[in-house]
C-alpha cells in the first residue's frame, strides 16, 4: 500500500504536466466558448432586426396618419368663336405653368395638369391636397395641328388657338408638345378685331386733322 501510494504520488507531477497533451479526450473549453460567442452574435442580430421592424412599423403608422386628398376632375372650358379656326379656353387658375401640359397627338389635343399643395392648420398638423385633370379635344379638319399655340393669362385662363389652314389628306400629322407661353394679357380673336378697328378709326381721325390744318 505504501508503495502504491508512493508510486501514484511520484507520477502525479508528470501526469499534471503532460495531461493536456496525453489526454485521450479533446479539450472542450474552446469549443464551448465559440458556441457561446456565436449564440450572443445571433441574439444581437435578432435584436437589431426586431428594432428595425418596430421603426419601420412606426414610420408606416406616421404616414398613415398624414391626411391627404386626391381630386381628379376636369376643369371648365369653353370654345371661343374664331371663324373656322380653333379657339379653346380652360380655367386653370389652380395650376402654375410648370404644372400644365399640352400635347398634340395627331388630330387630338391632350391637356393635363397636376398640382400638390401642403396645407398647415397652424397647430402642428398638416395635410396634402392633390388636384389633377386630364382632358382630350378633337381638332377640326380645317386646322393644321402644327399651328396650335397655347398661352396662359394672368387670370389663370389657358388659351389654345389655331387658325384655319387646310391640309392635304396624305400629309401625316406629327406628335409634339405645345409650349405654354405666359403673358399678362392674352387677346382673344374678338378683342383683336375690335382693337384693329379702333386703331383704324384713330388713324383716320389723325389724317383728317392733318388735312384740315393744311
Swiss-Prot record:
InterPro entries: A-crystallin/Hsp20_dom, Alpha-crystallin/sHSP_animal, HSP20-like_chaperone. Belongs to the small heat shock protein (HSP20) family. One of its GO terms (molecular function) is unfolded protein binding. Keywords: Stress response. One of its GO terms (cellular component) is cytoplasm. This is Heat shock protein 30. Gene3D superfamilies: 2.60.40.790. The lineage of its organism: Eukaryota, Metazoa, Chordata, Craniata, Vertebrata. Residues 202-214 have a biased composition (Basic and acidic residues). Residues 66-183 form the sHSP domain. Residues 193-214 are annotated as: Disordered. Pfam families: HSP20 (PF00011). GO terms for biological process: protein refolding; response to heat.
Amino acid at each position: 500500500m505504501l508503495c502504491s501510494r508512493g508510486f501514484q504520488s511520484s507520477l502525479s507531477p508528470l501526469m499534471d504536466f503532460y495531461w493536456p497533451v496525453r489526454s485521450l479526450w479533446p479539450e472542450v473549453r474552446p469549443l464551448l466558448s465559440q458556441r457561446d460567442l456565436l449564440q450572443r452574435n445571433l441574439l444581437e442580430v435578432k435584436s437589431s432586426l426586431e428594432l428595425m421592424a418596430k421603426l419601420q412599423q412606426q414610420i408606416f403608422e406616421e404616414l398613415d396618419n398624414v391626411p391627404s386628398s386626391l381630386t381628379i376632375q376636369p376643369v371648365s372650358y369653353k370654345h371661343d368663336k374664331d371663324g373656322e379656326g380653333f379657339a379653346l379656353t380652360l380655367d386653370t387658375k389652380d395650376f402654375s405653368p410648370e404644372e400644365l401640359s399640352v400635347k398634340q397627338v395627331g388630330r387630338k389635343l391632350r391637356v393635363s395638369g397636376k398640382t400638390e399643395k401642403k396645407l398647415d392648420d397652424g397647430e402642428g398638423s398638416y395635410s396634402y391636397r392633390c388636384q389633377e385633370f386630364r382632358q382630350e379635344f378633337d381638332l377640326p379638319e380645317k386646322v393644321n395641328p402644327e399651328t396650335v399655340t397655347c398661352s396662359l393669362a394672368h387670370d389663370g385662363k389657358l388659351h389654345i388657338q389655331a387658325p384655319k389652314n387646310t391640309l392635304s389628306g396624305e400629309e401625316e400629322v406629327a406628335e409634339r408638345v405645345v409650349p405654354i407661353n405666359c403673358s399678362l394679357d392674352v387677346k382673344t380673336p374678338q378683342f383683336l378685331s375690335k382693337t384693329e378697328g379702333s386703331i383704324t378709326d384713330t388713324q383716320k381721325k389723325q389724317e383728317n386733322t392733318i388735312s384740315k390744318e393744311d
